[in-house]
């Protein structure tokens, strides 16, 4: 299977429940009141425009396994949920329900977290753009079995706390909660970390990252001279300060995977970490099992940092480390390190000359495609002459991963995988578009629903098999 860009687009294909209602709202309508009416199978679509809110938008309704509740942009619309008038310390959107599909929204300038899933389960967030908030852009705590697809969280800064909390994505599940899945997401320019999975004890279900990107989180300073909250409701916090250079005390890490010596099993596949003043991939005191396959770290201080004194396991293969400031990788003697086919090992090497482009700003943050997938660029793609990296990886299949949801994405082109997060044909990771021809489903291979759970032949709805989506009626 050749790996391509990821897309899970389900709002228009889900079967509507008998008796379900479709709601359409505009910025002039009471969005909160409409959400409070939603029941299993209902659909709510937001028209274009800016929805100005000064209090938390609470989503506590629940669908069920066969009838999601949809809250999404109307087809072709780009609704903006704007919280610039909200008091500092107040969350933007909170989600406490189950079986929700929330898609196509811009969420910005919240007084605390942009969108916070608290005890939410079996929810899907897709094509969200979250920025300018006073804490983490997207946070998940407790609950589990949630999927976050093709979302961006960037330039969030908890200036009221000197920058120590605002991550792009904060996966802080608590004790013994099932893992969540992140696919095709980007985090950049946040005051703390790109992803922070602090203090989660696994129940055996790993947190999974597929084709995700993190860049330049924890910058030393922020230019806040044009931020609407700084010029408005929070102006009093900035008296006599130079708005063009506000110091940041956050942690400049990319993927931060653990916390407080707890066991947090984690799998990363075809992920990319660039330009962090600390670590690109960070153990962060994780005492669990961490698996990193076909990832790339570029221009971080430490590209792969796993030097904490815990009895952890690091399983790392087919990875590229390029232009680390301090070191390619750090590990600790207390850990069990299983590694092969990485550029820092004997017999492997890499240099800038192996890559088509290193134009980070011009390519990494390119606008997404209309369906939310990442634009294909040449950034950190291997040149055809990079024979030291092409087809030189460890051969693997889906059995190498614990997370069921990865099964539909694993693959490579050629006799063996290339090293790094991109195959040489310029592709990255994939679900192919939906087909209604269920005759193509192989009855001898497993199928999964959109939350990564294995389903049998009686299941009705969208199923995934070998990276292809089918609509089983």
What is each PLM-predicted segment?
Residues 24-28, 48-54, 61-112, 157, ...:
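Right-handed parallel beta-helix/beta-spiral solenoid domain characteristic of secreted/periplasmic
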Residues 47, 60, 72-74, 82, ...:
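Feature marks extracellular polysaccharide-active and adherence modules
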């Amino acid at each position: 299977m050749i790996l391509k860009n990821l897309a899970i687009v389900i709002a228009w294909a889900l079967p509507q429940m008998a008796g379900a209602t479709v709601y359409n709202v505009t910025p002039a309508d009471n969005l909160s009141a409409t959400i409070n009416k939603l029941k299993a199978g209902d659909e709510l679509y937001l028209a274009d425009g800016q929805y100005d809110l000064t209090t938390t938008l609470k989503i506590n309704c629940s669908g069920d396994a066969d009838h999601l509740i949809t809250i999404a942009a109307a087809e072709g619309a780009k609704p903006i949920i704007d919280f610039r008038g909200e008091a500092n310390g107040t969350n933007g959107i909170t989600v406490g329900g189950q079986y929700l599909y929330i898609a196509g929204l811009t969420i910005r300038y919240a007084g605390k977290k942009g969108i916070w899933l608290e005890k939410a389960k079996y929810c899907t967030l897709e094509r969200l753009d979250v920025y300018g908030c006073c804490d983490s852009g997207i946070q998940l705590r407790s609950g589990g079995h949630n999927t976050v697809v093709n979302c961006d969280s960037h330039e969030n800064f908890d200036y009221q706390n000197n920058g120590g909390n605002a991550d792009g994505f904060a996966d802080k599940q608590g004790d013994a909660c099932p893992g969540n899945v992140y696919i095709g997401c980007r985090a950049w320019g946040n005051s703390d970390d790109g992803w922070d999975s602090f203090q989660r004890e696994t129940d055996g279900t790993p947190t999974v990252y597929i084709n995700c990107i993190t860049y330049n989180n924890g910058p030393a300073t922020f230019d806040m001279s044009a931020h609407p909250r700084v010029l408005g409701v929070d102006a009093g916090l900035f008296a006599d300060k130079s708005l063009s250079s506000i110091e940041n005390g956050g942690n400049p890490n990319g993927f931060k995977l653990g916390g407080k010596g707890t066991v947090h099993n984690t799998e990363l596949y075809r992920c990319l970490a660039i330009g962090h003043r600390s670590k690109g991939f960070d153990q962060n005191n994780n005492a669990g099992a961490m698996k990193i396959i076909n990832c790339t770290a570029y221009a971080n201080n430490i590209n792969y940092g796993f030097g904490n004194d815990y009895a952890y396991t690091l399983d790392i293969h087919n990875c590229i480390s390029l232009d680390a400031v301090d070191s390619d990788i750090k590990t600790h003697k207390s850990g069990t390190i299983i590694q092969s086919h990485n550029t820092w090992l004997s017999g492997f090497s890499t240099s800038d000359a192996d890559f088509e482009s290193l134009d980070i700003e011009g390519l990494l943050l390119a606008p997404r495609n209309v369906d939310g997938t990442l634009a294909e660029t040449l950034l950190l793609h291997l040149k055809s002459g990079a024979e030291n990296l092409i087809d030189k990886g460890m051969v693997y299949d889906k059995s190498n991963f614990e997370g069921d949801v990865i099964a539909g994405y694993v693959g490579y082109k050629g006799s063996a995988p290339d090293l790094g997060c991109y195959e040489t044909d310029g592709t990255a990771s994939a679900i192919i578009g939906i087909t209604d021809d269920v005759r193509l489903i192989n009855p001898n291979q497993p199928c999964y629903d959109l939350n990564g759970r294995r389903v049998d032949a009686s299941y009705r709805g969208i199923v995934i098999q070998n990276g292809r989506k089918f609509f089983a009626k």
